[in-house]
Design a protein with these regions (language model features):
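N-terminal membrane-sensor/transducer module of prokaryotic signaling receptors
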Residues: 63-256
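Hydrophobic interface positions of alpha-helical coiled-coils
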Residues: 2, 9, 16, 23, ...
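Secondary-structure boundary/capping motif
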Residues: 12-13, 41, 252
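Surface-exposed helix-capping loop/turn segments at secondary-structure junctions
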Residues: 5, 19, 26, 108-109, ...
Length: 256
């Protein structure tokens, strides 16, 4: 019996020793993990610092580029106002002339009674069910689609540098567009966004500035995504459409 007790005690001591060894191993592993975690944390902090510095430089470069574009826009405006001929002069003259022609066309429709002022200036935008991106109609949409596309397509076809020509009201609503960008919507929202740009509302900075502009013309520039990671610099010149003394919106002309 005494021998059995001694054997049991030896077994217990051996088990405790084994457990102590395992605890030491776990503790060592934990310490190693802690040390490695500290190293990784330091590396992450260093990487984050580098990324922050890179982001700061990238933001600075973007701002300098935007400042350069803004300076270019102001230069175009100043030269046009001074009557100096530049490569942009024909586009400025074209959009101003066509904006006046569209305004006169709408005034004739009002005089004939085929269009009412309430319909022309309707700003109740009714979503078209099932469209993505969402399209809208107003009481002016039907008349716009009847009257304006032939003018818009003629303008676009007149110069290979012109990418689009479209009117937009004071809230960025485009009731009609070039035929190329007025296709029936399909199931792919990305395709729709590129090819179904009529009956849409646009609130990007360029559209907002063009829509609200009351100066004789507005010149802007921006980078247009052409897909596949390729971008091109687009110039956007617009002129206000004023009907019966009321500012309806603007005619936009985008070109490269």
């Amino acid at each position: 019996e005494t021998t059995a007790i001694a054997d049991a005690m030896d077994h217990i001591r051996a088990s405790l020793a084994e457990m102590a060894g395992r605890v030491d191993t776990v503790a060592g592993d934990a310490a190693s993990i802690h040390d490695r975690s500290s190293e990784l944390s330091a590396e992450i902090d260093l990487a984050a610092s580098g990324l922050a510095e890179f982001k700061g430089r990238l933001d600075g470069a973007r701002q300098r580029l935007q400042d350069l574009l803004n300076a270019g826009e102001r230069l175009v405006v100043l030269t046009a106002e001074a009557g100096i001929e530049t490569p942009e002069t024909p586009f400025v003259a074209l959009v101003r002339e066509q904006a006046r022609d569209i305004a006169q066309l709408l005034e004739r429709e009002l005089a004939r009674g085929t269009l009412s002022a309430d319909d022309l200036f309707d700003e109740t935008y009714r979503p078209v069910p099932g469209t993505d991106p969402v399209q809208f109609t107003t009481r002016f949409t039907e008349a716009a689609e009847r009257l304006l596309p032939p003018i818009l397509d003629r303008i676009k076809a007149g110069n290979p540098r012109i990418a689009f020509c479209a009117p937009l009201d004071r809230n960025g609503y485009v009731p009609a567009h070039n035929a190329e960008f007025s296709r029936p919507q399909g199931r792919d929202p990305a395709w729709n966004a590129a090819h179904c740009r009529n009956r849409r509302r646009f609130d990007d900075p360029v559209a907002v500035k063009a829509a609200a502009g009351t100066a004789p013309f507005t010149v802007q520039s921006y980078r247009r995504d052409m897909g596949g990671g390729r971008q091109i610099l687009m110039l956007d010149v617009s002129a206000p459409i004023v009907v019966g003394g009321r500012h309806w919106g603007a005619l936009r002309l985008g070109y490269v």
